[in-house]
Structure formats: C-alpha cells, structure tokens
Amino acid sequence: MTVFEFEGKLLIVDCGVLFPEEHQPGVNVILPDFSYIRDRLDDVVAVVLTHGHEDHIGAVPYLLKERADIPLVGSRLTLAFIEAKLKEHRITPKTVQVKEGDRRTMGGFDLEFVAVNHSIPDSLAVAIRTAAGMVLHTGDFKMDQFPLDRRITDLGAFARLGAEGVDLFLTDSTNADVPGFTTSEKDLAPAIDAVFRT
C-alpha cells in the first residue's frame, strides 16, 4: 500500500496483504498499517489497484470496513477480482473501471493509466500528476514481448512520460535482481502439454 498526499487529499495505490513466513505459524495474512490514514479516511479520494494479485488487493476489504465508500479504480479484470472478494465480506464497492490510455481526475490527482504485462492479465501502471510534479507507479510488470494475450508493456507510453518529466519513479517487479530474461509464457505451452501427455 502506497499513500500519496497532495493539498490535504490522499490517494492510495494498491492495498494488499503479505503472506507469513515459515517462522510465523498461525498467521494467515499480514495487513498494511492503516494508522497513518485511519484518522483521515475522509481525505482518501480513491484506491487505485494496479492488478488483481492478493499482495495488491487482499487488504481492500479491511480498508473498506473502515470507510466503505472509497472509490476503487482499476481494470475490468482487477475490479472483478475485488468485487468477488468483497462479496465474501458483504461489501458492495464503489468502482471506477479504467483501461490503458484512460485519464481520470480524483481530487487533485490527475491519473493516466498505462498497459503493463504481468503474470495476471489486465495489469496497469499509473502516472499521477499534481501541481507538485509527476509520479510514475508501475505496479508489478514484466517484459514479455510475446504474451499470450498480446498485451505488452507500453514502453512508448513510458518514454513519453519520461520525456514529460517524471519526478518519482516507483517500480515493482518480482525477481528484478535475477540476471537474465523471463521466459515468455508462450514458450511454456509445449512443456505443459508434455506434462499432461505423460
């Protein structure tokens, strides 16, 4: 969970859970610390969800128990995941569906959404513009030039935003410290077929 503040308003990007390590028996999930925003929930203009993995959406039900009408902004698939999760908690969310290329203004935050490829479809990065500058938050992403859904990370949009001037770049990519390249998902199909044939 990342909280941005501008002129007294708060924008949250992602609100996920951590999973316990083996030395934490009996712990199911670890929630983010809501103490910074708990007394300022009325200042939260939205929660932007970059994709539907639990470490990015898993704590949303607990946040909405604090204030149920916070708008959730995300792609169609991401919102479908969170709506199903919230149904289990008997919460009906206020949602704003976006796609790559869309722009929305929430409070004093001008949001632009950019396609990124990840191990879950319909993932988005978000450029956040205010009078103070621009933040580019990638969410999780990978560089797969041949994804099964044919939706690649939009490097052209990143270049355009970079030329405009990014003041803060926040990026998150699993195994970014591992040398080499990620195998394309299309290259995994033959291996999966072989397993099922044996």
Each PLM stretch: what is its role?
Residues 1-48, 53-198:
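His/Asp/Glu-rich metal-coordinating catalytic cores
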